[in-house]
């Protein structure tokens, strides 16, 4: 998409923050309007995260206008809301390539721009990193300022509160901006509150506040009286007591869509000492009515026609693995009132919408709190219930100690339904489910299952749910199932694989949903094909039988080769002194960038053609 100067005359003047700061203040509302329209035009043509960016247009303009970026360091939490930031920092003409193979990264990325101070993708990291950056800036002594922008969802995570607690202790000079888009602008975010925010952030108030502290520091009763008086004045109109108790100077809430008001407040706060907290209220999807009404649906969008106000409906083809899980969950819950389902803020993505409506008293969205989710499940299991933690592979990493310490060591029957395992596509390095087999396989007595299709997925979920000797995990990918018939649910024998095809000389041991591609290769090379099903415990007897009757083995998985299922096969063969050549096919030892799942599998040699080429080259 070429940039239309006539359509966006003010935005055309801004291809860097230096150019932005040359604009007169009175032109900034027009710039915000054009930036919002350009974002709508661009993302509707290319796909991407949408509603969050619409809500942060004014904030982005104000921050870059007031602060001397990139010298001053601006950190975005998660990064869904950072599209306007990318547009204003030299990437305007490339925004149509975002999330595409070889295009702009879906989130702020240090390797892409000097304006991207912190590479992000997972939530709640900004304040911790910001403290470190602020401390480094203080030691540098160049008066460099640090700003963190965090959303109302991300700030619920424990890591954010750990960071704020530390900031209150060491008191670095930094600003945390809370972008609160959970509700529309309420009555208390009006003229009075905006005026109060500017007053409380102004130099006169700050000077009196700090001067008073020094003067009366030796008179404890008066110092305490002044502190309480200030708290009462603020408490009458602002909800910031928690942040004040953590050691921040709280300002807000203010209208996050008043760009000129934001600039005034930010200028007042820029030179304040110690940790500052600015609470702004925004509306997710601002400026595009369908997104304002349904910000969840418009959070991330495919290509769509903005004039229709609707996203394209799915073709009604095969169900996704998330839906397969959600249907199984509802079916099982209807038969067993001990079932409890937990998700860390991933209801829609994990296929749990229907369950949450049908069984609200057994559905727990714990917000962005993966560690709590796992230990909460442990408590439910101790109480005699059957907890299921539905979580993305990349987010389970955040609760690794809880899986080990709170679940596995105690042999608690918690089922982990691990979605988005393997290559996820457009979200890139931070979201690939590349490591779960490796980091779970080393946990004693953990049962790990890798279904090759949707029927096996259901059977494995059923098997894991009824496994009472410890934790179990079923990992399945993002995307649609393959269309096999669903058979009645039954428990699978733990640790047993099945031979799908008998061939000669070469055997392919497949783990997971690359099975259709592996089957094509087996047919082409007349190889034996085994659906291993279990990564732990491995079917050692079957592995040894196959090794004894074949000249070479190939393992296939959509997980990091290092420490993955193939590594487990190698360990079995070495332990039994079976010197059979083994080729491990899986994800390589680097972080996999964005692109469609099909593009990345082809590039990494995980489609049928790539696998066959690797095997032939290895055998040659």
Swiss-Prot record:
Enzyme class: transferase
GO BP: any one term: 1-deoxy-D-xylulose 5-phosphate biosynthetic process
A single cellular component GO annotation: cytosol
Residues that, per the record, bind thiamine diphosphate: 80, 121-123, 153-154, 181, 288, 370
EC number: 2.2.1.7
PROSITE patterns assigned: TRANSKETOLASE_1, TRANSKETOLASE_2
Binding positions for Mg(2+) per the UniProt entry: 152, 181
CDD domains (UniProt xref): TPP_DXS, TPP_PYR_DXS_TK_like
Pathway(s) where this gene product acts: Metabolic intermediate biosynthesis; 1-deoxy-D-xylulose 5-phosphate biosynthesis; 1-deoxy-D-xylulose 5-phosphate from D-glyceraldehyde 3-phosphate and pyruvate: step 1/1
Bound cofactor: record note: Binds 1 Mg(2+) ion per subunit. Binds 1 thiamine pyrophosphate per subunit.
Catalysed reaction equations from the record: D-glyceraldehyde 3-phosphate + pyruvate + H(+) = 1-deoxy-D-xylulose 5-phosphate + CO2
Molecular functions (GO terms): 1-deoxy-D-xylulose-5-phosphate synthase activity; magnesium ion binding; thiamine pyrophosphate binding
Cofactor(s) needed: Mg(2+); thiamine diphosphate
Subunit structure: Homodimer.
Family of the protein in this entry: Belongs to the transketolase family. DXPS subfamily.
Designated name of the protein: 1-deoxy-D-xylulose-5-phosphate synthase
Species the sequence originates in: Escherichia coli (strain SMS-3-5 / SECEC)
């Amino acid at each position: 998409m070429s940039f239309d100067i006539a359509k966006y005359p003010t935005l055309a003047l801004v291809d860097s923050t230096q150019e932005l700061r040359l604009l007169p203040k009175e032109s900034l509302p027009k710039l915000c309007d054009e930036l919002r329209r350009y974002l709508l035009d661009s993302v509707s043509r290319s796909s991407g995260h949408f509603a969050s960016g619409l809500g942060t247009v004014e904030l982005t303009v104000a921050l870059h206008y007031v602060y001397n970026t990139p010298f001053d360091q601006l950190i975005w939490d998660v990064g869904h809301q950072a599209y306007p930031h990318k547009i204003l920092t030299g990437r305007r003409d490339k925004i149509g390539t975002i999330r595409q193979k070889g295009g702009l990264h879906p989130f702020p990325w240090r390797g892409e721009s000097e304006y991207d101070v912190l590479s992000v993708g997972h939530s709640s990291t900004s304040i911790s990193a910001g403290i470190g950056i602020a401390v480094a800036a203080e030691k540098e002594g160049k008066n460099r300022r640090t700003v963190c922008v965090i959303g109302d969802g991300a700030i619920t995570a424990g890591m954010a509160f750990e960071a704020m607690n530390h900031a209150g202790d060491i008191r670095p000079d930094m600003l945390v901006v809370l972008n609160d888009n959970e509700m529309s602008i309420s009555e208390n975010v009006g003229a009075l509150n905006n005026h109060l925010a500017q007053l409380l952030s102004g130099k006169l108030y700050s000077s009196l506040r700090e001067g008073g502290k020094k003067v009366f520091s030796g008179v404890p009763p008066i110092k305490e009286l002044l502190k309480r008086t200030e708290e009462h004045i603020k408490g009458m109109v602002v909800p910031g007591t928690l942040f004040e108790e953590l050691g921040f100077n709280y300002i807000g809430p203010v209208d996050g869509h008043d760009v000129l008001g934001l600039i005034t407040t930010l200028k007042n706060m820029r030179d304040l000492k110690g940790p500052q907290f600015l609470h702004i209220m925004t509306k997710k999807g601002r400026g595009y009515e369908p997104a304002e009404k349904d910000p969840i649906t418009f959070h991330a969008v495919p290509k769509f026609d903005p004039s229709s106000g609707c996203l394209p409906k799915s073709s009604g083809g095969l169900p996704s693995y998330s839906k397969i899980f959600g249907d199984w969950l509802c079916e099982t819950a209807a038969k067993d009132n001990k079932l409890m389902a937990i998700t860390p803020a991933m209801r829609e993505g994990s296929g749990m919408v229907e369950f949450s409506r049908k069984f609200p008293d057994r559905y727990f969205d714990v917000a962005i709190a993966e560690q709590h989710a796992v230990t909460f499940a442990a408590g439910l299991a101790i109480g005699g219930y059957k907890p299921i933690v539905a979580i993305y592979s990349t987010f389970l990493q955040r609760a690794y100690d809880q899986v080990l310490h709170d679940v596995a060591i105690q042999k608690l029957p918690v089922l982990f339904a691990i979605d988005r395992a393997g290559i996820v596509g457009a979200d890139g390095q931070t979201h690939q489910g590349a490591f779960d087999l490796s980091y779970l396989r080393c946990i004693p007595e953990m049962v790990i299952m890798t279904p090759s299709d949707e029927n096996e997925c259901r059977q494995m979920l059923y098997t894991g749910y009824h496994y009472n000797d410890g934790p179990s995990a079923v990992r399945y990918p993002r995307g649609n199932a393959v269309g096999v018939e669903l058979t009645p649910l039954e428990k699978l024998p733990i640790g047993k694989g099945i031979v799908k095809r008998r061939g000669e000389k070469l055997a392919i041991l497949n783990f997971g949903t690359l099975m259709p591609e592996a089957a094509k290769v087996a047919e082409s090379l007349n190889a034996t094909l085994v659906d291993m099903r279990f990564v732990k415990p491995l079917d050692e007897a079957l592995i040894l039988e196959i090794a004894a009757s074949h000249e070479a083995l190939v393992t296939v998985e959509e997980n990091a080769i290092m420490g993955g299922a193939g590594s487990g096969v190698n360990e079995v063969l070495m332990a039994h002194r079976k010197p059979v050549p083994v080729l491990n096919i899986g994800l390589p030892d680097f972080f996999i960038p964005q692109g469609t799942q099909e593009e990345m599998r082809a590039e990494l040699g995980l489609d049928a053609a790539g696998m066959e080429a690797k095997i032939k080259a290895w055998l040659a």
